Amino acid sequence: MSRPNTRNKSKRPRADDCESPSAVFKKIHSTGAITKGDIKQLYMVWKPVCHGCHGNSKDSPNCFCGLIPAANGVRKSGLWQRTNEIIRALGPNPSTDLRDSTETPAGLTNLGATCYANSILQCLYMNTSFRLGIFSLEPDILKMHPVLDQLARLFAQLHSSKMAFIDSAPFIKTLELDNGVQQDSHEFLTLFLSLLEGSLSHSKVPGARTIVQHLFRGSVSHVTRCSSCGRDSEASSKMEDFYELELNIKGLNNLEQSLDDYLSTEALDGENQYFCESCQKRVDATRCIKLRSLPPVVNFQLKRYVFLPKTTTKKKISSAFSFPGQLDMGKRLSNPSSSYTYGLSAILIHKGSAANSGHYVAHVKDESNGQWWEFDDEHVSKLGLHPFGEKPGKSSNKTDQKPQGSSTADSVTNDDNNSCHEAAFTSTMEEMFSSTDAYMLMYKRIAKDENGIESNNISSNNSLPHHFVDEIDERNTSYVKECEEYESKKDVHLAYITERRQEVKSVLTEAPATPEEDSYFWISTDWLRQWADNVNPPSPIITGVRVHSSIDNSPIQCEHGKVPASKVTSMKRLSAGAWHKLFSKYGGGPTLSSDDFCMECLKDGAKNSVSADVYRDRKASLRSIAEAALAGNNPDGPLYFVSRPWLTQWLRRKNVDIPSDADSGPTIALTCTHGNLLPEHASGAKRVTVPEDLWLFLYETSGMKIDDIVTFPSDSQPCGICSQQLSVVASVEDNLRAVKLKQRQSHEKLTSGKSLALHPGQKYYLVPSSWLSEWRAYITATGKNISSLPEPQSLEVTINSLICEKHSRLLQRPLDLVCKRGTITQKASNTDGLTMISESDWILFSEEWNVAHGKGLCAEIVFSKSSQDNLQSSEAVPILVEDLDQSTNDLSNDLGGREPYVRTDPEVCEECIGEKESCALVEKLNYQNEDIQVYLVRGKEAPKSIREASAAVPVPDRRTSKRSRRTTSGNSISLKVSGSTTVYQLKLMIWESLGIVKENQELHKGSVEIEDDFATLADKCIFPGDVLWVKDSEIYENRDIADEISEQKVVVQTEEGFRGTLLTSSASAQLCQDISFSD
């Protein structure tokens, strides 16, 4: 059984009776009649209605596939994009900010850098006693004190607002805080409580007037005790108020150790002895802090920042710090009590590594149900029954499990070695938490009844004050209305989208007209596609004003107002029902029915089609004639000149229906400026003769005006003027060729570029190497290039430029001497230095370049009496040591250790050359954003190849191979540097790229180590393209480069703190301002 053929299963079969458009046009042109069948063929009406194409086919007016996506399909934009994308275009949905319930706390907006204030405000609000105290304030007091008023309004919104977060801007603005500057949350709390304490003192409500002192104020005394008499100092009995206890954490692991450190006894001895009033002398003594009373809420401020005197900046201590869920403070009091048990109620967290930046969040316990919440500005997250969230996979009620201290640190274990007070860790039920970012801890006293059982004494009167009810209700009503309006707008828009989609599907379902239907209408594909794909149907533009949506068929009309067959790929064939649906709703047009085919356009198309066939056939028949003409085989009869390159390109072009622009001008390249035939030996005037038939075809299809085409029969004579000019040029070139030939023969060895063997006692002359290189290229240029290269600069001018005006000495040095196999030569160069030539060559140069023989720069090879004599001679050029071999050594031994050097007349001007080289060096070291290569070397020393590349002297304006910038296995890097880049900055780049800390880098250029971090690369003579190598000493530990960079970026400024805000205003100034607000 044979398998079915599926190779062409996706191709639609062509109807057997379908003719090609070319055949139809030929029939129309020959008969002059247009039949109904011709219309079907030319307008592709015969094509079947298709289904399931991958895209919309331009070749079929009956194809409506791809105008809309498949079922359940979507597009990136327009009517058929995802529903959520359509809704997003309506703007933000206010309902996303809806608060779940008043049982869920609300957040506060961050105005830029106000997270420090937000976290403190949330801690204060979640304290039920403090909140009730603020809510109990009299309205008259609120009017007199703007800060209290804004705080009460903020608390009221946090209490009853339907929004998930509250705008803190009015409160921040009232305090005159700079919302763009990050501040310290501890300092803010201290100053804010002080400000509140002064403002609340005007209230007549007892619970509100002293709420700050009642909740947060405790007392301590600084006790100094004489070691001799055992008496306390008089000042020891004085008590000082505190609102928080500042605890050291550096080198300490937990809260118990920090409290021990805070209450530890200090010995006063030696130079710090205390003068005892009782003993009347300086004696040894002890000093300590004693807790006299504790408030219901104790704030522990953890000193996470230490001052660095070297950089005058603060650095954060990021070590883990442990603290318990319950804390017994009774034993800490000067009069011990067992009823002072505190529970953890809030944790203020500072995220970030820098002291002057980062982010504050607060973890606060809800006193009503024991749930913990994270307050991160606008975002509020439920943490569960533990301050850092439930441990995944663990039940919170298992007493043998300790909760996680944070998401990144394990809970602290009860290790006696790490505990200062065993009593604090005896219970296996006790919860311990650990954090690397905890900045402040709030503990609230646990109230107990007479039987020692914890009691919840939270007041049930937690309702909103009556003077805020109307305001909050109005805000909530406005917000709910905004949410409802958005939902209504969304519903209307989605209903419209659904309606539009149903409309498009309905029309497109009815749109296809079968080939047999005689009644149909044409519509622009572009308009139909936009109508089917856009949310709003396309609209024409009239005088710049968009009018009602309407059908636009003007792009598919011809100049006669009908439908041309040439536009069939830009239009679709609609059924009568689909057209009437669109036209009745959108109007427009013009209406183009099945009878609106254009007879005039069809006749023109038939004529053009026949002309194209004729052109194509004629060109095909003449190709063999053109090929024979290029081969020189022409038939008898008249011949004409055409450009040979042009005819070659004409043959290479594809056979098209009409002549192209490239077919014009077959004789343009042969026509001179005088309108005559160019001589054949002129540049670009190569020609070939073609028969008359081919010429007439090229003439007719050139596309040029008749007057612009110049015909050259084969007996045409070349232009006399151009011939004469070319003869003159040829004569000049012949003379130049003879002169160059003579010079090449006269200076045969010099022309070849071979090194000249130098001998002591002979006279030589010096010529600039650059001039000699130009002269060699000039005389060796032949053929077409014989006159293309310019003549070198006058030799006399060149020689004169080598003499300095100040000292009349040479401004360049002779090239270095090289001695190989007993022969002395000069190092080869085409750009730098002076090359020595023989006396005979100089005599010939004098004659050829009209230079006086006496102006020559003389030189000779001499031997020094000793190596010291050679070094002391200013005009001496030393021999290259690396080129010495055994023969040279034998020669040197025969000469008694003397070395050859070049003696010049005039002498070399070392002063001017040194000044010029210094300027060039300075200019070269003044570079910007250039590449250097750094290799990482593992081992004791760098490989020889790297050392030599690193020590190589850079060549001016050298081109560096791209391959030299490739890295191999991460062992080399290419860095962009400038001459002003410091060694320190370069080491930071290497640190970032190769991971070697700055202190461990042993950086070298060649064998010289690069030191002094403050020196620039220009100071160290490091040039563009240089190769350096670095080795890791591994002496210092690795650390993060971010620490180094952040320290460098910190600009030391005087800390302003809260200067200029109400938090630092005096009480009198605050009172005056309060009165002015009330006015």
UniProtKB/Swiss-Prot annotation:
It is an enzyme of class 3 (hydrolase). Residues 106-446 form the USP domain. Residues 1-12 have a biased composition (Basic residues). Keywords: Hydrolase, Nucleus, Protease, Repeat, Thiol protease, Ubl conjugation pathway. Residues 388-401 have a biased composition (Basic and acidic residues). Pfam families: DUSP (PF06337), UCH (PF00443). GO terms for biological process: protein deubiquitination; proteolysis; seed development. InterPro entries: DUSP-like_sf, Papain-like_cys_pep_sf, Pept_C19_DUSP, Peptidase_C19, Peptidase_C19_UCH, Ubiquitin-like_dom, Ubiquitin-like_domsf, Ubl_USP48. Residues 495-598, 613-715, 738-862 form the DUSP domain. Residues 961-1037 form the Ubiquitin-like domain. GO terms for molecular function: cysteine-type deubiquitinase activity; cysteine-type endopeptidase activity. Its main location: nucleus. Its EC number is 3.4.19.12. Residues 402-417 have a biased composition (Polar residues). Residues 1-21, 384-419, 948-972 are annotated as: Disordered. Belongs to the peptidase C19 family. Recognizes and hydrolyzes the peptide bond at the C-terminal Gly of ubiquitin. Involved in the processing of poly-ubiquitin precursors as well as that of ubiquitinated proteins. Deubiquitinates H2BK143ub1 of histone H2B. This is Ubiquitin carboxyl-terminal hydrolase 26. It comes from Oryza sativa subsp. indica.
